């Protein structure tokens, strides 16, 4: 790990083991696909209304404020690094009308008559000067945030609002996200942008990228043959059908049948990670999983990102004799 620098030295002296910086920022591809579309920050800020809590008409923290707050925290914490602009993806558009246009035919509506906001939004912010190369793939440090109004009760009075925030590494070959437990807040509840800002700084400060990169590097040292690969995919398909009492004794697996099928197709056809007809190393297997996860809806994307990491590392350990994930290879 000769290329990674880590976090501001004043705050993270003990965790900075290897370091180096220097690279040019590249335009990124989609980190999530599914049914999302790309939008600009200006569109969210200027063209979208802000939902409220129905019982007291108190404002929610809208998507633009969420993104702006995390970007500010990122630029503050990584003040000596180059920070990219947010790449924003949204889904599930909610359309409405202003009161004056309630009785207008749809064909006669003006843009000024319409209202719009998005139920779900996700964004990523790359820090390209903090990077590492694994198996020839460049990984940039990246912050990812997710907001989904469908996971909140907007029909009540104002209460703490749910956000998801992660810091990890993005594979620049394919924009697959590598997320670990210590870099993920899955249940971040706040009532203001000030609380959100502080929570982001706390997450960045507790993050230990050297440990993550060590584990990711280890995946390249293990291979499995085609029979083992097919065995694992079969067990992953079987997992979906197991009764609850049986599933409780097996590590969680969140990928859907469709995503498992995508892993199988990518094993044959993917331009970066296909291994059809030969042994596949666990780094490639991991990227087949994270690639399939890009088809997740926004509200389940980060949970599945973490789960794909756990599965890849768990199966890697099982191939070396560990018992926890042994069911998937036995």
Regions found by a protein language model. Name each.
Residues 1-25, 105-330:
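Intrinsically disordered, low-complexity regions enriched in serine/threonine
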């Amino acid at each position: 790990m000769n290329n990674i620098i880590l976090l501001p030295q004043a705050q993270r002296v003990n965790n900075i083991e290897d370091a180096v910086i220097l690279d040019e920022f590249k335009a990124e591809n989609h980190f999530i696909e599914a049914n999302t579309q790309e939008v600009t920050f200006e569109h969210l800020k200027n063209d979208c209304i802000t939902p409220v809590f129905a019982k007291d008409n108190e404002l929610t923290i809208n998507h633009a404020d969420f993104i702006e707050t995390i970007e500010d925290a990122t630029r503050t914490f990584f003040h000596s690094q180059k920070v990219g602009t947010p790449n924003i993806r949204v889904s599930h558009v909610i359309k409405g009308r202003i009161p004056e246009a309630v009785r207008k035919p749809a064909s006669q509506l003006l843009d000024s008559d319409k209202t719009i906001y998005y139920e779900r939004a996700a964004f990523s912010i790359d820090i390209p000067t903090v990077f590492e190369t694994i198996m020839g793939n460049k990984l940039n440090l990246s912050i990812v945030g997710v907001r989904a109004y469908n996971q909140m009760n907007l029909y009540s009075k104002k209460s703490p609002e749910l956000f998801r925030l992660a810091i990890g590494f993005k594979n620049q070959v394919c924009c697959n996200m590598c997320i670990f437990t210590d870099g993920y807040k899955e249940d971040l509840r706040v009532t203001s942008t000030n609380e959100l800002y502080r929570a982001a700084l706390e997450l960045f400060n507790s993050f230990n990228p050297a440990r993550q990169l060590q584990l990711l590097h280890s995946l390249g040292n293990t291979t499995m043959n085609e029979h083992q690969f097919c065995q694992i995919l079969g067990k992953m398909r079987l997992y979906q059908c197991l009764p609850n009492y049986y599933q409780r004794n097996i590590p969680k697996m969140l990928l859907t049948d469709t995503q498992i099928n995508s892993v199988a197709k990518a094993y044959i056809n993917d331009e970066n990670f296909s291994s059809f007809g030969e042994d596949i190393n666990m780094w490639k297997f991991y990227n087949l999983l994270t690639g399939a996860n890009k088809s997740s809806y926004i509200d389940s994307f980060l949970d599945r990102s973490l789960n794909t990491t756990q599965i890849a590392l768990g199966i890697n350990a099982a191939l070396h004799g560990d018992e926890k994930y042994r069911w998937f290879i036995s």
